[in-house]
Amino acid sequence: MNSQITLFFFFFSILSLSQISNSSSLLKPHPCPILPLPSSQQLQWQLGSMAMFLHFGPNTFTDSEWGTGKANPSIFNPTHLNASQWVQIAKDSGFSRVILTAKHHDGFCLWPSEYTDYSVKSSQWRNGAGDVVAELASAAKEAGIGLGLYLSPWDRHEQCYGKTLEYNEFYLSQMTELLTKYGEIKEVWLDGAKGDGEKDMEYFFDTWFSLIHQLQPKAVIFSDAGPDVRWIGDEAGLAGSTCWSLFNRTNAKIGDTEPSYSQEGDGYGQDWVPAECDVSIRPGWFWHASESPKPAVQLLDIYYNSVGRNCLFLLNVPPNSSGLISEQDIKVLEEFSEMKNSIFSNNLARKAFVNSSSIRGDQSSQFGPKNVLEEGLDKYWAPEENQNEWVLYLEFKDLVSFNVLEIREPIHMGQRIASFHLETRKTGSGEWERVVSGTTVGNKRLLRFLNVVESRSLKLVVDKARTDPLISYLGLYMDKFSGSSRNTTKITITRTLKEEQQLHDL
């Protein structure tokens, strides 16, 4: 009997120890996301970073920007049109999708619409049997990049424009053609522009949105007010220094949204509506023989102020009257890509030992600070709950020189950070000195410094957040192109022999 009791307690003890061991190995759950959150298509759109706009149509041949809708269709004759060239240039330059003006304000359709004769079927191109949308859709699919389509609400050719029901039926029919004949569409672009003195027109936006989501559920819809993507409020490609993906759609109206609200978003917004920054590589949106492209360094500056401010960079690269992207533009895009890749291919922070003020769970947690050196949304640093400070520390064996800071949030968990700053230690005194400050982060925040910083000890401090901050990536880079690297500020700290040995052993 005693031996049975002893055996019972032995197995009970083993079972208890096993349960304790299993309990201690359980992972701390992920923190709760904070609303609003991006949809799957919004998330994919934001991670795409850059898209190429293609303004093309009769305006390309009439040397105009806003066509009257009266140009003879026969003028449209791009004899060397090659949509594969457009797509390959976009892909080689790092763009995730192309967006074509299938119909601009002049009403001319780049596909053979069954609802108007004012289209490619009335032109000389391909003897009236051509379809620009079809050729681009095929090229994009083959290259593996997304396709977006622009369908102007304002139509200067269509006679029923101004007749509310009749024109909305016309527009919805053309939209249906585009969304059912050309495969998967990633973005539908609705321009809020309309000239002064034009006919009054009520658009059935809610019906349009419902139809688009019904026919192309993976597409995002762009307009001044969303519902999925908003306009940044200018045509210079520049976002606000504070830029939330949060937005209140009830505070916005297509064609009449306060520019500052579009620029900054709304930290208290109830909707997730990230911003898109559109700008043309040339002075005009359509190709003009008399115009030249912006220099590559200017595109780099726009990249910092769009992608680097939590937005998508939509760069217009208009095909010329031959139907090709001009060599001038190609050269600029190649230079821009080389600059961008040269800067961001080498994250100097990867050389650092990273620590933090706290970790959600414990030191063996899946939310440790080393996660910020790995790209991707799945891993991130999360501090312990209810802390009064949120800090990441970076220590380097050797001096590191940089003039660009990158921070990313795992936006599938919501946008959280409202302000932050970077500090480095002074030589000799060891006191912390602020280098740069910023506000929102979101998908990606890039900050350039006036001076190059040389340091061994850094700390990133989150000053304010909507809830406990999460950081998915941290980068330090050297930009030798922007003109901000002429001055060097050497900021170092002497360490004890023990500290040096600890770093040496990493």
Curated annotation (Swiss-Prot):
UniProt record, GO biological process: carbohydrate metabolic process; glycoprotein catabolic process
InterPro entries, sorted: Galactose-bd-like_sf, Glyco_hydro_29, Glycoside_hydrolase_SF
Record GO terms (molecular function): alpha-L-fucosidase activity
Secreted among keywords: yes
GO CC term, one of those recorded: apoplast
A Pfam cross-reference name: Alpha_L_fucos
Top-tier EC class: hydrolase
Keyword terms, alphabetized: Apoplast, Glycoprotein, Glycosidase, Hydrolase, Secreted, Signal
Signal peptide: 1-23
Substrates-to-products reaction catalysed: an alpha-L-fucoside + H2O = L-fucose + an alcohol
Enzyme Commission number(s): 3.2.1.51
Location(s) in or outside the cell: Secreted, Extracellular space, Apoplast
pH-activity profile: Optimum pH is 5. Activity decreases sharply toward pH 7.
Disulphide-bridged cysteine pairs: none
Glycosylation sites: N22, N82, N248, N320, N355, N487
Keyword Translocase found: no
The family this protein is said to belong to: Belongs to the glycosyl hydrolase 29 family.
Function of the molecule: Hydrolyzes both 3- and 4-linked fucoses in Lewis determinants. Not active on neither 2-linked fucose nor on fucose in alpha-1,3-linkage to the innermost GlcNAc.
Name of the protein in question: Alpha-L-fucosidase 1
Species per Swiss-Prot/TrEMBL record: Arabidopsis thaliana
Source lineage: Eukaryota, Viridiplantae, Streptophyta, Embryophyta, Tracheophyta
